[in-house]
A protein has these predicted regions:
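Structural motif
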Residues: 67-69
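A general structural signal for short secondary-structure junctions and capping/turn motifs
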Residues: 22-26, 60-63, 86-90, 178, ...
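Short, charged beta-turn/beta-strand-edge "cap" motif at the junction between a beta-strand
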Residues: 73-87
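Compositionally biased, charged N-terminal/linker segments
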Residues: 2-65, 75-78, 245-247
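Short acidic alpha-helical/loop segments enriched in Asp/Glu that coordinate divalent cations
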Residues: 86-94, 108-114
Length: 247
């Protein structure tokens, strides 16, 4: 009898201590959907083994939760990173879908993900590659631009909450700064499926039949089919590697 009572006490204590955790596990999660007009590998950035959304879409970045999924779909016309226009006249296709594994503020992102900072390119090549620095020192004709790194907001020392915007390959300037920072957070996705605009995935309507406006969120339980399909048929990461992708 004492053994049974002791067992019941242990179960009760465990339930009380873990009540908040159990509640969080039961919290509703969503799939956030939006249309993309640009796909330049900047927002989102699928490189270095993790997909990040650090700029654009401030409402999603501000209100999404860990465990939510985000997805970008084609508009009728989508610009790639070389400003080529790809047209989609027969409905939306999936450019990427990703599960949010971590949400962090900009200052933490700056320090923890230095590989995501924009890197200077000379004549299309990284400054760290052999020959590029020589071109600059010898005064040869060069063109300088930046890769698609999205970690572009550097915290200002001793001035909490202020950031300096770095030169970047995403086309973002000071006019975009307030819009980007209003999202408060950077979304980190360890599990992601990035098809890219050139290989955007056609999704059967039996798997996903929702119209995609500028932004829409749907309960995960209502879109389980498309997530299960993607997970079963593709490996997490950049799904199609080709010469268009800048690592």
């Amino acid at each position: 009898m004492k053994t049974v009572q002791r067992f019941c006490q242990i179960i009760y204590i465990f339930a009380v201590c873990n009540r908040s955790r159990i509640y969080r596990m039961g919290k509703d999660n969503y799939l956030h959907c939006y249309k993309m007009v640009w796909d330049t590998e900047f927002a989102p950035n699928p490189h270095h083994g993790v997909l990040t959304l650090a700029t654009c879409k401030p409402r999603i970045r501000k209100y999404a939760n860990v465990g939510d999924w985000i997805s970008g779909w084609t508009s009728v016309k989508v610009h790639d990173k070389n400003n080529r226009i790809i047209e989609f006249r027969n409905g939306e296709r999936l450019i990427y879908i990703a599960k949010i594994s971590k949400i962090i503020p900009f200052d933490q992102y700056w320090h923890e993900y230095p590989q995501k900072r924009p890197h200077e390119l000379i004549n299309g090549k990284s400054l760290t590659r052999k020959g590029c620095r020589c071109c600059r020192e010898e005064g040869k004709n060069i063109s300088i631009h930046y890769d698609c790194g999205d970690n572009i907001y550097k915290p200002v020392r001793n001035n909490s909450g202020k950031f300096v915007q770095l030169p970047n390959g995403g086309g973002h300037n000071e006019n975009d700064k307030d819009h980007d920072l209003s999202g408060k957070n950077v979304l980190i996705c360890n599990e992601f499926y990035y098809f890219g605009v050139h290989h955007a995935c056609k999704i059967d309507k039996q798997l996903f039949s929702y119209p995609i406006p500028r932004w829409k969120k749907i309960k995960l339980e209502d879109v389980a089919k498309i997530i299960n399909y993607i997970q079963s048929n593709y490996k997490s990461g950049i799904v199609v590697e080709n010469e268009d992708y800048t690592k």
